[in-house]
Amino acid sequence: MTASLGYTDQWSIDQDRKKIVGASLVLWGLWYDEGRWFAKWCPRSRVIQRIALDLLRHDLKPHLSRRCKHLKGHGGVKGTVRYLRRVVDRYRYVARFDVMAYYESVDHALLRGLLDRAGIDADLQRIVADYLALPDRPNTGKGMVAGGSLSPLLGGLYLTPLDQSMGKDTRMVYVRYMDDFVILARTRWHLKKAIRQIYRITADLKLRLHR
């Protein structure tokens, strides 16, 4: 692999991989605030998560869509707004969606499957598994903590099946910011087709939409 976002050379990547060999996370506590769960990790676990985040950003970069704008280096809120303002007048039909209780609905098995398909190694997989499972004390097999270092990246990955499907149709504009996404279409037919795809894919991911 070549060096990527967050790294300047291959040696640094290799050194970070060595640091997490056999690593696991330790959860110190959970609290609930404004409808979301937050986690407190031990200091060593926070260090491991920072390293894992850099490695996951590097390893997942080829698999994450540029249409997912909340990810580092993808434009952010300001870039998304500027882009939409630039193109919106060319399209007659607009639809906006967001996912109900997105973090709470992320299915662990489906997310691990996406990591598998991206070729993520066993050490990173184990850290992600701890990150998902340890706060899941009812053992529901779903949900991510809010405010966690890995959650934005994993949340970006989870909806890549939607990004990939919507990105195939060059007659529409599709952009996403975490679990909020916008579609611009020139015809009602294209918009309806896109909406059907969105509902099908989000249902496959065990998600429900606000509309």
Can you say where each PLM-predicted feature lies in the sequence?
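Non-catalytic, polymerase-adjacent accessory regions of viral genome-replication enzymes
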Residues: M1-D16
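Short low-complexity stretches enriched in small and charged residues
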Residues: G6-T8, Q49-L55, R137-G141, R186
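Reverse-transcriptase-like RNA-dependent polymerase core
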Residues: I13-E34, V88, A122-D136
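A broad, low-specificity signal for short, low-complexity segments enriched in glycine/proline
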Residues: D14, L53-D59, K142-A146
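N-proximal short alpha-helices
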Residues: V21, L25, R50-L53, R57, ...
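Glycine/proline-rich, flexible active-site/cofactor-binding loop segments
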Residues: W31-R66, P135
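Conserved polymerase palm-domain catalytic core
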Residues: R66-R67, K72, V81, R85-R211
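Soluble or luminal CAZymes and related metallo-dependent hydrolases
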Residues: G76
